[in-house]
Each structure stands twice: as C-alpha cells, then as structure tokens.
Design a protein with these regions (language model features):
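Bacterial N-terminal signal peptides
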Residues: 6-14
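Pan-zinc metallopeptidase signature
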Residues: 24-34, 192-276
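Acidic/histidine-rich, surface-exposed loop or edge segments in extracytoplasmic proteins
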Residues: 27-48, 138-140
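An active-site-proximal "capping" alpha-helix that borders the catalytic cofactor pocket
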Residues: 147-166
Length: 276
C-alpha cells in the first residue's frame, strides 16, 4: 500500500511538473497591455494624439481580450527612426508611427473604381497589421504548430478575423487591405531579393486575401470574379482554402478562447468608417 501511495505521489508530481500542464494552468483571458510611446519626431505628434483620442489601442485590447494567454502581451505605438514597420518580438507587438503615416498618406482621397473609400483604405490595413502580428504572438505563446511559412499563417489568421465582422464591414475591411497590397505590388521593391523574403510578395498577398474572402462568402464577394480582380481558376478552390483555415482556427486556436468574453466582443459594434 505504501509503495502504491508513493507511486501516486510521484505521478502527481510528474504531472504538475510537465511544461504543457504548467502552461495550461497559467492560461487566462484579459492579458493584453497597451502603451502609447510619445513620438520623437514632431511630425508624428498629430498621429499620436489621434490614436489616443480614438482609443485605438484600448479597442484592440478589448478585441483581443478573449485570448487565454500564459503571460501578458503588450501592444504599443512608437516611433521607429524613420522605419515604416511593425513586428512581434519579446512579448510585444510594435507598430511604428511611420507605418500608420504611410497608411494615411497612401489612402485615396476619392472612392476608387473598385469602391474602396479612404476610410476603408485606412481601417482595413490598420486592423490587418495588428491582427497579423497578433497571429505571430498567438503562435508563439500557445506553441501553435504551423505547417509552411509563418508569415502566410499570420496573414490567414488576420484575414479570418476580419471576415468575422458584420458582412458589410468585413467587405470594406478586406477591400481596404487588398487596396494596400495592390498599391505595394505596383511599386518597385526596395529589397535586394524580394523572392527570398519571409513574406509573400504583395501581389500574392493581394490574391490570397481575396481568395479567402471569396471562399468565406461567394455571394458577398461575387463581384471579385465578375470584375476580374480574382481569376476564376483560383476562385474554384477558394472555398476549400477557407474551410482549411476554419478547421485550423477551430482546432488550434478556439480552445484558447474565453467564450464569455468572445460573446461580448461579437455583440459589440466596433467600426465607424468616419476616418478622414
């Protein structure tokens, strides 16, 4: 009996020392922290004030709060000495003021022939960059297995979440993101060898985002085919591509979602397309 009791104790100790068990025991929702770092460049001061007035980081904090994470994740805006960039590193998602400056500068003043408004071209890429970097953070924090390039998986993570908004909002966000990719694709690459980059080429990301959107709702995005934005040959497999992402999100990410908080997030009206 004593030996059996000893075995039980050792087994319990072994179970609780298992890294996977320890990580799960620490998981909880509402682990998001935020930081607006005052810009060094005075040209970014209006953008800094606008982001604070609009409570942009507070909204992202609430939107991501259902994620059950093992430790805190910080979201922050800061100046990057002229570098237009965004990244996840050391438990923090950083988006540069320069990056948002480019988004505002590149957004069209008038509605485009494709129906993209200035607000679409600002809100879409703004949400996408945070959700893309959040994808990297989630993969790291939760040790999510990724088959293929992590950058592609982060794009899919972001696009999937954009498509969970109300249909009319989701359409505008996706078209705003596609506008940004298409604009980047039209410019000469500044990289020495863009084919060696960990990211897909802007043109590839453009078609991938449209394909996921069409696969999610063929009726809502039917005009992508009619107007020639998405080739019919690619469109034929888009429903399967989207379903594959849904299965991955359901199996790999959903177990780490606090459903009570997620319900509140889903019920909230998030977007106001009033950006100038």
């Amino acid at each position: 009996m004593k030996s059996l009791f000893a075995v039980m104790i050792l087994a319990a100790v072994g179970l609780h020392s298992d890294p996977a068990f320890a990580q799960k025991s620490k998981l909880r929702a509402d682990r998001i922290q935020i930081e607006y770092v005052p810009p060094k460049n005075p040209d970014h001061e209006p953008l800094f004030r606008l982001m604070k007035e609009r409570r942009v980081l507070e909204k992202f904090k609430e939107f991501l709060s259902p994620l059950r994470l093992p430790r805190a994740l910080r979201l922050k805006f800061e100046g990057c000495d002229g570098d237009s960039n965004a990244w996840y590193e050391d438990d923090a998602i950083t988006v540069c003021y320069e990056y948002f400056d480019d988004i505002f500068r590149n957004a069209p003043r008038e509605t485009t022939p494709a129906g993209v408004t200035r607000a679409d071209a600002i809100l879409g890429p703004t949400l996408e960059v945070f959700l893309h970097e959040a994808g990297h953070a989630v993969f790291d924090y939760l040790k999510v297995p990724v088959l293929g390039r992590e950058e592609d998986a982060a794009d899919q993570f972001a696009t999937y979440l954009l498509l969970q908004f109300a249909k009319s909002d989701a359409r505008r966000l996706i078209l705003g993101v596609a506008y940004s990719y298409n604009l980047d694709a039209s410019k000469p690459s500044t990289k020495k060898n863009p084919f060696a980059d960990e990211h897909g080429l802007p043109a590839q990301r453009f078609y991938n985002s449209l394909c996921m959107a069409y696969g999610a709702d063929e009726k809502l995005f039917a005009d992508l085919i009619e107007k020639g934005y998405l080739p019919k040959e690619r469109a034929e497999g888009c429903a399967d591509e989207y379903d594959q992402v849904v299965r991955a999100m359901t199996k790999l990410i959903r177990p780490y979602i606090d459903e009570t908080r997620a319900k509140r997030v889903r019920e909230k009206q998030w977007l106001k397309f009033d950006v100038q």
